[in-house]
From Swiss-Prot:
Gene: queF
Name recorded for this polypeptide: NADPH-dependent 7-cyano-7-deazaguanine reductase
InterPro entries: GTP-CH-I_C/QueF (IPR043133), NADPH_dep_7-cyano-7-deazaG_red (IPR050084), QueF (IPR029500), QueF_type1 (IPR016856)
Catalytic activity: 7-aminomethyl-7-carbaguanine + 2 NADP(+) = 7-cyano-7-deazaguanine + 2 NADPH + 3 H(+)
Organism: Elusimicrobium minutum (strain Pei191)
Top enzyme class: oxidoreductase
Family: Belongs to the GTP cyclohydrolase I family. QueF type 1 subfamily.
């Protein structure tokens, strides 16, 4: 292991993870059977909490609804709040998943953040939830 200190702190790591964001609204699912819903935001942006530089990527939300479906306009406003937020990519995928699960309580959900390469490294973060 290298002894190089890259200057990351616990504050950097936690930044944005507990941010208060607009509520994601839902509407009543009309079907009892399982079916898949995929929502993509191809122009997602946020800010690196350490460098202040913008991060770009594609956020994909896949879920199997239970009683509720996500309302897209409120979801869009929710996702736009990340634009000026300092938050690590790993926290983005996990926070979105937590907030989606809290809002609509799906049977299953996966949030994928596919971020534009930075320094030659591409990051794809996949956060998963399955109702027990």
């Amino acid at each position: 292991m290298s002894d190089i200190d890259f200057g990351y702190t616990k504050d950097h790591a936690r930044k944005g993870a507990n941010a208060k964001l607009p509520e994601i609204q839902c509407w009543e699912n009309q079907y009892k059977r399982d079916y898949d819903i995929r929502i993509e935001l191809p122009e997602f942006t946020s800010v690196c909490p350490k460098t202040g530089l913008p991060d770009f990527g594609v956020i994909t939300i896949d879920y199997i609804p239970d009683r509720l479906c996500l309302e897209l306009k409120s979801l869009k406003y929710y996702l736009l709040e990340y634009r000026d937020m300092g938050i690590f990519m790993e926290n983005i995928a996990n926070k979105i998943l937590d907030d989606v699960v809290k809002a609509c309580k799906p049977k299953k959900a996966v949030v994928t953040g596919d971020f534009t390469p930075r320094g030659g490294l591409r990051s794809v973060i996949v956060a998963k939830y399955e109702k027990k």
